[in-house]
């Protein structure tokens, strides 16, 4: 009887990548494994996918270092770039690809390149890790997300300066959709047009704008590289499941019934007595709570799966437990498995009941949850 287990199917993960390849057959795949591979496990995900993809994308330098230190020698892109001088030097020494999204990053790169030219044979550089250069730069253009990226009219200036920098090997272009999960969205079409115009004279260079939603719904924007993220894990980037497209859920979150109780009509349940049964019933207590990362704000009626049937959460989720209404005729027993989400209870359904996105559910599981890889 094990509480709070996240079972990760490597087979499902590989299956989903093969499906993505069919959706983008001519493109290279940069698998996004940021945020602990969307909560699925950074290093297990990298090991499972290494022979199927053309590189990995991460958001933090330490993620790139962890993957490379396993012996992986392929492309690793820092999708937010380097945050300071120390990170830039480490990026150079390890040969990571990096995004440039602002003037400050460009100026720091130019400054380090100038120092290298002057001091490359002196002790200044002998005190650093050996530099492997040049590195590949991905110039990020803000086409409408308005989060990171240079303005489209700055592309020529940034390109010229990067082209003249001795620490730059190749220059690619990327952007990010803000509403790609909305089908037939004029704003997304506008972003594509902006990206096209900004990179028109650089069409010989690699380009990328399509992440998960772009892969699914905007094939005209696949360009040379696509960046699958949450869909690798069989999860939709919105509330509509993608299992009908052939994707398989990678994670099953499960736990155990640790108590079964007869409950009288009119009696409250849980902290604050927020739920009161209108009839006699049987309650089950599940070893899963917000201490495991299950949302405390999950409302009454949020579904869980026990013995092949959906039952609702009742009362407030507590730190270590939650309570479900098994029904008066329940035949369930202590020790029975409880599925919080997985193949037969999709995470999109749970997320919609709670009023969050699936991304939050999978990335907020705590270290108390046991991860098993199969």
UniProtKB/Swiss-Prot annotation:
Which NCBIfam families does the record cross-reference, listed alphabetically? alr
Which catalysed reactions does the entry list for this protein? Answer: L-alanine = D-alanine
Extract the GO molecular function terms from the UniProt entry: alanine racemase activity; pyridoxal phosphate binding
- Gene that encodes it: alr
- What SUPFAM superfamilies does the record tag this protein with? Alanine racemase C-terminal domain-like (SSF50621), PLP-binding barrel (SSF51419)
List the cysteine pairs that form cystine.
Answer: none
Q: Which GO terms describe its biological process?
A: D-alanine biosynthetic process
Instruction: Provide the positions where the record notes the PTM N6-(pyridoxal phosphate)lysine.
Output: 34
Q: Which family does it belong to?
A: Belongs to the alanine racemase family.
Identify the EC number(s). Answer: 5.1.1.1
Q: Which cofactor does it need?
A: pyridoxal 5'-phosphate
Xref: Pfam families:
Ala_racemase_C, Ala_racemase_N
What name goes with this protein?
A: Alanine racemase
Function, as annotated, reads: Catalyzes the interconversion of L-alanine and D-alanine. May also act on other amino acids.
Q: Which UniProt keywords apply?
A: Isomerase, Pyridoxal phosphate
Q: Does the keyword Isomerase apply?
A: yes
Which species is this record about? Answer: Haemophilus ducreyi (strain 35000HP / ATCC 700724)
Domain of life per record: Bacteria
In this chain, substrate is annotated as bound at 147, 319
Q: Name one GO cellular component term.
A: cytosol
According to its UniProt record, this protein's enzyme class is isomerase
Q: What is annotated as the active site? A: 34, 271
Q: In which pathway does it act?
A: Amino-acid biosynthesis; D-alanine biosynthesis; D-alanine from L-alanine: step 1/1
Q: Which InterPro entries match?
A: Ala_racemase, Ala_racemase/Decarboxylase_C, Ala_racemase_C, Ala_racemase_N, PLP-binding_barrel
């Amino acid at each position: 009887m094990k509480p709070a287990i996240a079972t990760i199917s490597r087979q499902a993960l590989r299956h989903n990548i093969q499906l993505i390849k069919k959706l983008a057959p001519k493109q290279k795949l940069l698998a996004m494994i940021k945020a602990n591979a969307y909560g699925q496990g950074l290093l297990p995900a990298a090991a499972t996918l290494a022979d199927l993809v053309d590189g990995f994308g991460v958001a933090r330098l330490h993620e790139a270092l962890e993957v490379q230190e396993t012996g992986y020698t392929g492309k690793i892109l820092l999708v937010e770039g380097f945050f300071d001088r120390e990170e830039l030097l480490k990026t150079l020494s390890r040969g990571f690809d990096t995004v440039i999204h602002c003037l400050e990053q460009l100026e720091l790169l130019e400054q380090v390149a100038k120092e290298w030219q002057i001091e490359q044979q002196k002790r200044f550089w002998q005190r650093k890790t050996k530099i492997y250069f040049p590195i590949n730069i991905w110039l990020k253009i803000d086409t409408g997300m308005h989060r990171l990226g240079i303005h489209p009219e700055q592309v020529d200036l940034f390109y010229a300066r990067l082209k003249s920098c001795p620490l730059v090997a190749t220059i690619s272009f990327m952007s990010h959709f803000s509403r790609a999960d909305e089908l037939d969205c004029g704003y997304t079409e506008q972003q594509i047009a902006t990206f096209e115009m900004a990179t028109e004279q650089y069409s010989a260079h690699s380009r990328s704008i399509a992440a998960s939603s772009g892969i699914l719904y905007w094939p005209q924007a696949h360009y040379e590289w696509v960046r699958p993220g949450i869909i690798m894990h069989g999860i939709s980037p919105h509330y509509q499941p993608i299992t009908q497209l052939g994707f398989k859920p990678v994670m099953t979150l499960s736990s155990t019934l640790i108590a079964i109780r007869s409950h009288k009509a009119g009696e409250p349940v849980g902290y604050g007595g927020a739920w009161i049964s209108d009839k006699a019933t049987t309650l089950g207590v599940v070893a899963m709570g917000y201490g495991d990362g299950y949302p405390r704000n999950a409302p009454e009626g949020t579904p869980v799966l026990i013995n092949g049937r959906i039952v609702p959460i009742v009362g407030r989720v507590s730190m270590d437990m939650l309570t479900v209404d098994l029904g008066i005729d329940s035949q369930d027993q202590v020790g029975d498995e409880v599925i919080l989400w997985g193949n037969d209870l999709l995470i999109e359904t749970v997320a919609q009941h709670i009023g969050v996105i699936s991304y939050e559910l999978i990335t907020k599981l705590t270290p108390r949850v046991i991860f098993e890889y199969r």
